[in-house]
Amino acid sequence: MSTLARLSLESQGDVELAKVAGEVDASNVADLSQRLLAAVSNKARALVLDLSETSYIDSSGIGLIFDAAARLRNRRQELRLVVTPRSFVGEVLAAVSMERSVPIDAQLDEALRAVDDSG
């Protein structure tokens, strides 16, 4: 992965938390996607993808989110996003109506609570 994006992973019970900081673009999306999906065990109920520290995302990053959502759905797992409202990433995801496919929360604790409520 290029130095544009940093990925940190953490398990919280049966929820995997992935935080992406920096820029997500065509130069690093393949590695980022591989690492994200490998981090989600079959026993996990959900992946919470925290993009609150992501400063930039291009169409390849958007594709990564749609692809991850489809793969997780096939495994009967949930994907939730954490995105700062009115940020660049938030505006881009709103422009492509991401919330129609993947639930978006403004805060990490909201996302974790929603996962708990759905299980």
Language-model-derived ranges and their functions:
Residues 101-109:
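Short acidic-hydrophobic, aromatic-tinged amphipathic segments that line or gate anion-handling sites
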Residues 14, 86, 109:
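Residues that form or immediately flank small-molecule/cofactor binding pockets and catalytic motifs
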